[in-house]
């Protein structure tokens, strides 16, 4: 029997469906006759959805109209159709803005270039702004009642500044000449105007306007951008070249990019609409006003989705291959923004779409409780149905897990490359919309949270939870299963990657199993979204910096600070230079700042950190400076109180206290008529000197921004403490966090040489002043706090232990100092720590610099720079930094073993006393007397760990190591790495491969018999799932070496100082173990030896000595 050429699920869905039959509904809008087009498309459908269990695909080009089936009803698929499970959307009618203003909340903005011949019905009074063309800003948002809004704002020009020595008339001719020589511009219409203006440069202290400065204005942003770049390449000095119309509008008019706005004068469109929103209006830039008093949200629509694919072969699905089809898409629709009390007033239609589940599937599918199941005859119809649903539901936020790199990319490539469909028609704009993904060529992301991959969907903000989890979590891997277990204590459905195709092809019930799996993934992402609340955090940053929410998600830290400085400088009649050339040694950093671009598709490098610069300084372009100070620690185990003091907001307070700024920097050697009292001068060890004018001469823009934000944060936290509404509390908390993070990012903004406005003098001054402050605290503590008179100012005699006072700094790191407080009771240090910190602050510093008391350790293991572990007074958990317990690479078993050892040292008095005693011994003492009895517990714990590893008693899941895949496998110069070998093995077995940015898990297995003892790790690395499935033995020796190495690194301070090879010390003190197979048991047993049966049929013999140090290690397998 030949296969059918067109698939209808209701012709092969069982007797019940044939009895019930199915009707056909033309779901297209309007009641008139529909036009029967002859457009053909390719139908691709798995044979298994027709013939249960069969493999392969059926392909046919058909001219039948696309369709879907829902509840035994057939629907014809049209872009404008009303979706059967969503309420019908009706365009709201509003007046012309004269009777009642329109108040709406905006969350997304784009700029469009509109021409005079546009089909849009533009109000006659605004048409002058688009003749011959003009920038139109489209603001998307929602009203209080949940109606979607598109506000078309007219009249925003594009402009930049440039210096030109010739006459004003000649400049027009020169600009015209440049434009004629600019590629792709000669056929575009625009208007151009150049006017002489008087502005100051932000860079460097100056009292004179920039000479020969012109403001170049165009009504076409793409042309404006190209012209500015061309002028820069010709050597002209250009200012603010990359600031787009949206940034101009928000900054110049003080309009929030995420917040409430009011429009008192507008025109409501009734036809010639540009969007699919419920309300669409036109207005001018002067008609939009900010309503900053209200920080609440309306109810925004969200959608969490996931896709399932099936490869035509035995490889991982590739979207460019016709046979690698999408078989299912799940969507969870829900709302965010309002609290329960606030949402009571939401309309019934809006409430109906608040939360529900949808599944789009190929072929017939058994019902899934609580889920709308849509069945499609082919992949194209499934994809078309999903995009039509996306357009009908019109989500404001789209989320998923790893959707930037996989799901969205896969769907777009299938629609565009395989089926040649235009996906931009499914955005919120009727024309001119974009639905695209941007992956820069040749740019290797440092990690999965990199902003190098950008997704643009007009009117919808895409928020991938995968990079959010990577940025906020330290985990061995970042699979959805791991994150769900960590944050939600939930798990994915138990269905492996290999089981999906046969289960899907089995029958209707099998497709329901895969459907539930797909829905569960989307549901877990939705719960992660609500658990982490990153959307509130990103929205707070967008509100603060006046940049679109999508820029917060995709553009990193630099653009946020740039926008804030742009606004503040504008209020002082200052402008920001733009540069294309790379920084040259010895030049002011401002001479090399790259173009500050607000473009969606800009390839600029942006800093994604919180603003920290390494102590090595910059290495880009030959410019460097010494970074933050880290003092050499006094290594050791301290069983006396150790107080930790740190500076509150160190770098921001330095900027404010010393008036550091681009605008206050004074190039030395320039005669500005300033006295010595007017200048703050810094001189470095190499003779370099930097000067900044003091506050009475000119106030620092950076300092005023920081002071305002820190004061705002203080007031927000005060309101937060009194707030009762949970949603409002969350918004306020994220806002104060945004203020804190943005303040801390200023140093990184000035210090990152590849950033938008690096300035070596500012960054070097900040770190130098920070070092001086740290050293002044160290000197003060060591000079004055070692005397009883100092402590008796705050303490009584009963607060001292009676032992000799031993107070000194044992470690200093950037903004923190660790002070040993020997002879003082721990509780007393805690009680009076703030008072002591205040005393030091008053003695050494002036506001706003402040030293604070952070915590006190009961005991502390200081290992080396950046590495320590200790027990904080009053807490039951250890505080640690830099050791394997907080690293992603270590396996869980090593972590648990080290944690057990540390807990014994810090929480068991006899072990702690033994550790102190051991640290005071020499190797001769150990050989003569053995290790202290308190240390026997650690020896026993390590011996037990060795037994568990050698006898294969450890769960393989606890032995999983991992490494990050930072680039494509082929790009690695060194191929003999464990995680790369695992990927090669996965590829050979045609299994699912990790993506760039993922952490690749692996297990070290036992080598083949006869292999070298020192077999490289890459030769014995294997995928954990494969190890478990095939019950492969692990390499106990390798893992125990890792345990011993890690414990040695942590316990280094208590190992006798004269031990020549500390890594061998534990091998000296551990009892001997010999592991033999069971057949040798009668020959291996001695009278005084302990024999234990092994799980694998072997036995373990152990020899214990009274002095364990005398027993060496001898192991045979």
Swiss-Prot record:
Gene Ontology MF: a single term: DNA-directed DNA polymerase activity
Alphabetical keyword list: DNA replication, DNA-binding, DNA-directed DNA polymerase, Host nucleus, Nucleotidyltransferase, Transferase, Viral DNA replication
E.C. number(s) listed in UniProt: 2.7.7.7
Domain of life: Viruses
Region called Disordered, residue ranges: 591-621
A Pfam family this chain is assigned to: DNA_pol_B_exo1
Annotated Gene Ontology cellular component terms: host cell nucleus
Main location: host cell
Primary enzyme class: transferase
Localization: Host nucleus
Reaction catalysis annotation: DNA(n) + a 2'-deoxyribonucleoside 5'-triphosphate = DNA(n+1) + diphosphate
Record GO biological process: DNA-templated DNA replication; viral DNA genome replication
PROSITE patterns assigned: DNA_POLYMERASE_B
Entry keyword annotation includes Secreted: no
Biased composition annotated in UniProt, kind: Low complexity: 606-618
Record-stated family: Belongs to the DNA polymerase type-B family.
Protein name: DNA polymerase
